[in-house]
């Protein structure tokens, strides 16, 4: 897909990719040993003058949890299972990263891809997420590939129109269907939550009959803490 086609979704006035730019612009920002070692560091990607800078910088994470039957007391925690794929700050860097990513249909079940603003980790406990929530839509697998691409491009292009309120988007590959989620900062801001929901429905062209579920991170954290307390007493 060309950058011009991407502009249809998020209104960037970007010319066709020129020779010498594009994928090469993201080579130093994809998943590599430096990213693995410095995953907690807020490293701002360098944007050369000829590239088209995004409003925000982003990082992409991958995680995969084992099936329930394989879970044990020694299973790696969620935070440790997150693997940094790369960081992007321009249109060219994004396409350089995206063209090397596995498509949803190629990912095994229980895999997740997380595209978040740089500095925000895809965890409930992150300070930017702890008071927020997410909208979740369930899709047939045949719909997921296009919907995930549209969702990423809409986030990069500020099509949700809520500015810093938006934290990230998540693809969750499951056995029978897939889930897409949009995370935002403030669950108590009902107006902001409604704007995110309405934008999600518009971006994915979801009919009114398709349900979108809301989950507040605080509720999930409290439930998780209760479960941990019960396990500690058992």
Predicted features by range, described:
Residues 2-234:
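ADP-ribose/nucleotidyl-moiety interaction motifs
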């Amino acid at each position: 897909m060309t950058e011009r086609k991407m502009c249809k979704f998020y209104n960037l006035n970007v010319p066709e990719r020129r020779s010498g730019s594009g994928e090469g612009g993201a080579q130093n920002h994809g998943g590599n040993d430096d990213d693995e070692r410095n995953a907690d560091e807020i490293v701002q990607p360098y944007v050369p003058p000829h590239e088209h800078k995004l409003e925000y910088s982003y990082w992409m994470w991958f995680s995969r949890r084992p099936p329930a039957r394989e879970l044990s007391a020694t299973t790696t925690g969620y935070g440790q299972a997150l693997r940094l794929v790369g960081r992007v700050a321009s249109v060219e860097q994004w396409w350089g990263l995206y063209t090397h990513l596995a498509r949803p249909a190629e990912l095994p079940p229980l895999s997740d891809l997380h595209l978040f603003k740089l500095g925000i980790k895809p965890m409930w406990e992150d300070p930017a997420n702890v008071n927020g929530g997410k909208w979740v839509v369930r899709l047939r697998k045949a719909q997921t590939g296009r919907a995930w691409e549209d969702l990423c491009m809409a986030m990069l292009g500020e099509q949700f129109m809520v500015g810093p309120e938006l934290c990230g988007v998540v693809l969750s590959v499951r056995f029978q269907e897939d889930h897409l989620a949009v995370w935002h900062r403030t669950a108590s801001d009902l107006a902001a939550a409604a704007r995110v929901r309405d934008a999600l429905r518009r971006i994915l062209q979801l009919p009114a009959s398709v349900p979108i579920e809301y989950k507040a991170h605080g509720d999930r954290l409290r439930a998780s803490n209760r479960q941990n307390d019960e396990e500690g007493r058992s």
